[in-house]
Each structure stands twice: as structure tokens, then as C-alpha cells.
């Protein structure tokens, strides 16, 4: 067996296993519960060389396969840990791995993952001052180095900085989540605070190279070019279209203020410093292996897209690719194919593009589904929605079917009148301008706090739809700063344009199809084919997606004949 990885189901461990397997190595993965195999399969990794073994590093180890390289990526990371809980993994566990590695006759290297703020310290760490996590990591680092010298174990310590990438929802991710939700009123630290990053892909490639390098090294693996924290947060804010805090609070003041006021856990504050780190040896090893770090700004933007898509660990993206793009001045959240979609799907209120997930799964060909400007995850624009739509479709090289829902139907009609050559057909699902107006309460300012406080269950009940991931996604957006207010404004704006939209509908020159639910029927006569789905309400694509897809397909076949 080439290598064994402890902590193989963790964020670093699982990616390291994937990297080693991709390199053709035979890998033993030490797990308590095997969630690793399914994750590797989801990443398309060939697991023929993988052996999963059960083990608990908090206990003395035995019965594990003989290997050449040992990686300990296991750690108990959390703030507010008890001392014994933290030491069990970060000190005792680290020593148990080392003691077992020392018995291996063919051991080439023990690679111990420490931390950029905890390595190369002396003395006994102060648990009361540092907190259990950081203190236990410091103690474990010192203990592993000392015991390795005693047992003459070939050891390399790798000290990564803040590791970012898909699936990372702790550490810096919590700061980004506060920024995204509008809770980050001021930046912690000062103008020179340095919180370096490294991507998970780069880190595991680096780790895979370590056993062939000389033993006894300490490698600080981080991007020296990471922007200082204020600039870093500003870059993420610009990318995601949210305001960046203009004020900062010095760490010294944060330590003195009550946690209820600052929202900052005391243990997080020691990571906010202006320190720099000795990266020369790590950069030399990377250069010899041909490894290059991706630009920090690009890595942060890609990670921010991943965080928003996954709702910071609370959900799973329903389609890829996804991310923020500038459309008519709006940082717009876009899901799907931007260049050759067969269908372009525009959501209605109060939903976002996730509304279309059940229908999209039943449609042939690629789709493009954005969040409308100012709604869902998209930032606002000063342009009319139809102008924004024209810019959204400017890279599109096909003539897709434009499918709009509810209040998006008005802008879709205006776009179809102005740009008939850009689309092949217009489908209006529950067009609000042809239906009864929304209740007065939904248009009032009283609706704003109600929407912000609504649980997903209450929202689903109000809309008459199942409480699925689509509704949970919408409820999460409505809690963000400004979204509920913009939804209420959009309801009023849409109502004011009903007469204009009805008049423009007769000027659309491409084929038009209308789909409504029987409990939310049309209240105005139309000269276009209209389909009524029995038992459906205002959101037939959620409650009856198969029937909506069937009607869309039937119309396409008819047009193609």
C-alpha cells in the first residue's frame, strides 16, 4: 500500500485521497463512517486503488495495513471546544498516529498537517488565553516534533493557511456568509490584517509531493499575494454585488467588547494579525514539482460562487455551471448554459431561478436560468428588466424558447416585441398581467417584514407549493438585506404595467404559448393558445412539472412540423 490518510472524510483528507488515487497510488483511508466512497464517486474519482479501514485515532492504533507514506489530516476544529475534547484528537490522536507510524518497517514519511498560526512555537500553550482549539493544535505540534525526534521518525510538518474550495464552510466562509447576508457591519481587525489563503486543489497537490522531499522540513503553504483582509472582503463584495463594510473594529477593542455585541467568538480573534510567514521552502518545493498557485483573486471569486450556490453548506446546487456575471450593470446570478441554451427560464415572485429545477430536469437540452436583477441572489440594476434581458442574451448563439413566469412575463413580452429574431418561441407560465392582481397585503410595505421572517414551511403554505429546496432557497434570499423590500416593490411595479403588457402581447410575432393552473386562471381574453393544468395554482412548474414539460414539448413538436 502506498499511503494511508487519517482524517480521510474531512475537507482536506478526502481531497488528498482523491489526488493520490488520481496519481495511481494505492490508498488506505481511515474512517469512522464511510462517507468518503460516495463523495469520491460524485467527483468522478476511480476508487479501484482505495481501501477503507475503520479506525479511531483517539485510541492506540493497530491492525492497519503497512504503508510507505502516512498522512495525518485529522483535526478537531471548532471554537468553544472543551479542553479534553480538543486534546483527544489534536494531541493524543496526533501522537497515536506517530506511534503507529514508527512501527512501519518501510515508512518513508509521516506528513503531519498543522496550521500556519500554530507551528514553530515553544513552551506550553495557554489554553485559557488561546482557547482549546488553537492551544491543542500548538500542543500537538510540539508533541509530535519532540516524539518524532525520540523515535527517529521521518517527519514533515505542513502548515496550511485558510484553505478554500468547494465544500469549505468554516473559517473565512463564516465571514463571507455574514457579508452576503448583510450582517457584516464592520470588518474585524485593521487595515494591515493579513488572512492568507490557499486553494484545496493546490494544497493536496503539494501534499502529494512532500514524501519525496527531504524529511525534517516545515512548510508554510499559503499565497503570499493574498490581499489584506479589507481588500479581500471588498473583492468578494464586488464580485457578489453586495455592499462592503466601510468601518473596521480593532482586534483589541473586539476582545474587550461583549460577544453579544460583536458576534465574534473570542477564539477567532487570534487569527486576525498582520504577521507574515516563512514560505521560501514551500515555494521551492512547489517550483521543483511544477506547481503554480492560481491567482488569489480568481480563487476567491470561484469560491464565493461555490459558497452562494451551496447556501454556505445548507443546500446542494441543482445544476452547473453557476456563478455571478455582470449583466446590464447587475452582478447577476446565472445558472446553466450561457451560449447555447435551448430554453431560457425567467422566474417570478418571490422566487429565484431555483424555481425551475423540477421542470429543468424534464426538459431536453441545455437551459439558462438567471435570478432577475434585485431578486434572489442578483444585485440591482438601473436598467429596465427587458434591457437587462437583452444583455443577458447577448452571448447566446441559439434562438432559444423564452419561458417566463408570473411578473417576468411582462418584461419577456417587451423583449419579444423588440427582439423577435433572438428567440424561437415565447411561453408565459401564469402571466400575472393576465390574471387577478396579487392581494393588497402582498403589495404593501407590511409584506416586507413578513417575508423576511417567513420560514420555508410558512412560505410554502402561503404559496400553495411543496416545501422543497426551491422554497427553502427563496426563504433564505428573503432574509437577506433588501431582497424582501425589492420583491414588494416589484409586485407594485408589475401591477402598474398590466395594461401595457396586455396591449403588447398582440404585437409579439413569434409563437406564443400560455400555461396556467386551474385554480389561478386567466381573467383576460387572449388570442394565443392557452393550456390549463387541472389542480395547479400559480406555480405549476413546481407542483406539476411533468405536465408543464409535456405541454412545452408538444408545442415544440407542433411548431417543428
Q: Residue spans of the language-model regions?
A:
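N-terminal Rossmann NAD(P)H-binding glycine-rich loop of SDR-like oxidoreductase domains
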Residues: 3-23
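Amphipathic terminal alpha-helices
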Residues: 279-330, 555-557, 561
Amino acid at each position: 500500500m502506498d499511503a494511508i490518510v487519517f482524517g480521510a472524510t474531512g475537507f482536506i483528507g478526502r481531497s488528498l485521497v482523491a489526488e493520490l488515487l488520481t496519481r495511481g497510488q494505492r490508498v488506505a483511508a481511515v474512517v469512522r463512517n464511510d462517507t468518503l466512497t460516495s463523495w469520491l464517486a460524485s467527483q468522478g474519482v476511480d476508487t479501484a486503488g482505495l481501501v477503507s479501514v475503520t479506525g479511531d485515532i483517539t485510541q492506540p492504533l493497530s491492525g492497519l495495513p503497512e504503508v510507505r507514506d502516512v498522512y495525518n489530516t485529522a483535526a478537531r476544529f471548532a471554537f468553544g471546544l472543551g479542553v479534553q475534547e480538543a486534546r483527544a484528537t489534536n494531541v493524543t490522536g496526533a501522537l497515536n498516529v506517530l506511534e503507529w507510524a514508527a512501527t512501519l518497517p518501510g515508512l518513508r514519511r509521516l506528513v503531519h498537517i498543522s496550521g500556519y498560526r500554530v507551528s514553530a512555537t515553544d513552551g506550553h500553550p495557554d489554553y485559557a488565553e488561546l482557547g482549546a482549539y488553537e492551544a491543542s493544535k500548538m500542543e500537538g505540534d510540539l508533541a509530535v516534533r519532540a516524539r518524532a525526534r525520540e523515535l527517529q521518525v521521518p517527519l514533515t510538518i505542513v502548515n496550511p493557511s485558510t484553505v478554500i474550495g468547494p465544500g469549505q464552510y468554516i473559517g473565512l466562509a463564516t465571514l463571507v456568509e455574514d457579508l452576503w447576508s448583510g450582517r457584516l457591519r464592520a470588518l474585524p481587525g485593521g487595515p494591515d490584517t493579513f488572512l492568507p489563503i490557499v486553494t484545496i486543489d493546490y494544497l493536496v497537490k503539494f501534499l502529494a509531493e512532500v514524501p519525496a522531499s527531504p524529511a525534517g522540513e516545515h512548510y508554510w503553504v499559503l499565497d503570499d499575494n493574498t490581499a489584506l483582509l479589507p481588500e479581500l472582503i471588498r473583492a468578494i463584495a464586488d464580485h457578489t454585488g453586495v455592499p462592503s463594510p466601510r468601518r473596521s473594529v480593532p482586534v483589541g477593542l473586539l476582545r474587550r467588547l461583549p460577544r453579544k455585541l460583536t458576534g465574534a467568538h473570542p477564539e477567532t480573534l487570534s487569527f486576525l494579525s498582520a504577521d507574515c510567514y516563512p514560505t521560501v521552502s514551500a515555494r521551492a518545493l512547489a517550483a521543483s514539482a511544477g506547481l503554480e498557485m492560481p491567482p488569489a483573486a480568481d480563487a476567491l471569486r470561484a469560491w464565493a460562487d461555490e459558497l452562494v450556490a451551496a447556501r454556505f453548506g445548507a443546500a446542494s446546487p441543482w445544476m452547473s455551471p453557476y456563478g455571478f456575471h455582470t449583466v446590464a450593470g447587475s452582478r447577476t446570478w446565472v445558472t446553466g448554459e450561457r451560449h447555447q441554451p435551448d430554453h431560457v427560464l425567467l422566474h417570478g415572485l418571490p422566487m429565484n431561478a431555483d424555481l425551475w429545477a423540477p421542470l429543468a430536469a424534464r426538459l431536453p437540452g441545455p437551459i439558462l436560468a438567471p435570478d432577475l436583477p434585485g431578486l434572489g441572489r442578483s444585485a440591482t440594476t438601473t436598467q429596465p428588466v427587458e434591457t437587462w434581458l437583452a444583455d443577458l442574451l447577448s452571448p447566446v448563439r441559439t434562438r432559444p424558447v423564452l419561458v417566463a413566469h408570473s411578473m417576468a412575463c411582462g418584461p419577456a413580452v417587451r423583449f419579444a416585441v423588440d427582439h423577435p429574431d433572438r428567440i424561437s418561441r415565447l411561453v408565459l407560465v401564469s402571466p400575472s398581467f393576465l390574471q387577478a392582481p396579487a392581494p393588497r397585503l402582498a403589495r404593501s410595505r407590511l409584506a416586507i417584514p413578513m417575508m423576511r421572517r417567513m420560514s420555508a414551511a410558512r412560505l410554502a403554505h402561503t404559496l400553495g407549493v411543496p416545501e422543497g429546496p426551491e422554497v427553502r432557497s427563496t426563504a433564505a434570499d428573503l432574509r437577506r438585506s433588501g431582497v424582501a423590500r425589492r420583491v414588494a416593490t416589484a409586485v407594485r411595479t408589475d401591477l402598474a404595467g398590466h395594461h401595457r403588457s396586455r396591449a403588447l402581447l398582440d404585437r409579439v410575432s413569434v409563437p406564443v404559448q400560455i400555461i396556467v393552473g386551474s385554480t389561478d386562471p386567466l381573467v383576460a381574453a387572449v388570442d394565443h393558445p392557452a393550456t390549463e393544468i387541472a389542480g395547479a395554482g400559480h406555480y405549476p412548474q413546481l407542483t406539476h412539472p411533468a405536465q408543464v414539460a409535456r405541454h412545452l414539448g408538444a408545442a415544440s413538436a407542433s411548431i417543428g412540423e
